[in-house]
């Protein structure tokens, strides 16, 4: 099972101090989806977080055996999360990435758990206790590389019962009084993501215009790209829970159930072919100008 979830710090009552009631739909959805997945035979939870360590040219997988973190950054240091890492699965994902020439692994520094990791686990821990974790960051690499890395995860988890959580808020510019003010790209981006979730249209995660993405001030897209790769050639049933953005940031929750194989959903290869065709068209167009010159 996989899911896309947001990570607003104020959803934690000790941080929100009552303000969290404004996003009650998100809280109810979080409770519902985590309650549901707790009935599944989960051994390991993979969390992809935009707030874990991020490099421009390398996807970081947290090393070590154990990690912890708290919300002292948000004045709630008493709320603490501890995890044991699935070192065996970390090794398998790293090996798969190396085999497929994706720059990913456990090199570099590590730090305490980030809020993009802890908030989903805060809700999961209410219903499920005995599991290990793999924590993965995002990078400045291309959309297709994030998708291909997701395929490495898929290869590595073949014989394992895994829950994959793609942590990420949507646009941060939905309202004038939001963190980045209002930009028209914000609601448009959120609409496109919600539609893509509802239709399991993972190609959409790869095809956004980079300037549009920058203007939308989004957070979760690369997490979703990795998740999409992990579901490559899988038959998917989407379970959309909720969407709201009262503070000017989009919070959406959607789960994806795997219902078997679907070889037509080789979205990475379809995207690559699409890009090659576009480059070919541009080149042909350039050739016309060269001839005219």
PLM feature segments, named:
Residues 44-46, 163:
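Structural motif
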Residues 51-53, 170-171:
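Catalytic metal-binding/acid-base residues of hydrolase active sites
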Residues 151-157, 162:
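Non-transmembrane, aqueous-exposed alpha-helical and coiled segments at domain scale
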Residues 164-173:
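Acidic/histidine-rich, metal-coordinating catalytic segments
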């Amino acid at each position: 099972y996989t899911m896309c979830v947001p990570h607003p710090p104020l959803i934690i009552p000790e941080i929100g101090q009552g303000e969290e009631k404004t996003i009650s739909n998100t809280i109810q959805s979080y409770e519902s989806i985590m309650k549901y997945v707790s009935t599944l035979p989960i051994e390991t939870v993979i969390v992809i977080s935009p707030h874990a360590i991020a490099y421009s040219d390398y996807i970081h997988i947290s090393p070590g055996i154990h990690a912890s973190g708290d919300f002292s950054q948000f004045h709630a240091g008493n709320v603490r999360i501890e995890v044991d890492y699935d070192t065996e699965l970390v090794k398998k994902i790293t090996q798969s990435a190396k085999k497929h020439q994706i720059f990913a692994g456990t090199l570099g520094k590590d730090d305490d758990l980030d809020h993009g990791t802890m908030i989903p686990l805060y809700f999961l821990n209410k219903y499920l206790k005995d599991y290990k974790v793999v924590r993965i960051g995002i990078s400045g690499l291309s959309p297709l590389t994030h998708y291909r890395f997701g395929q490495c995860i898929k290869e590595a988890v073949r014989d394992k019962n895994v829950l994959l959580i793609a942590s990420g808020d949507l646009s941060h510019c939905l309202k004038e009084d939001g963190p980045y003010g209002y930009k028209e790209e914000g609601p448009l981006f959120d609409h496109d993501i919600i539609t893509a979730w509802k239709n399991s249209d993972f190609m959409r995660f790869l095809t956004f215009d980079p300037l549009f993405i920058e203007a939308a001030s989004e957070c979760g897209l690369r997490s979703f790209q990795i998740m999409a790769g992990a579901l490559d050639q899988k038959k998917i049933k989407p379970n959309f829970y909720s969407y709201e953005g009262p503070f000017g940031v989009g919070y959406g929750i959607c789960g994806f159930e795997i219902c078997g194989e679907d070889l037509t959903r080789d979205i990475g290869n379809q995207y690559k072919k699409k890009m090659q065709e576009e480059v070919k068209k541009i080149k042909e167009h350039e050739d016309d100008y060269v001839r005219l010159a």
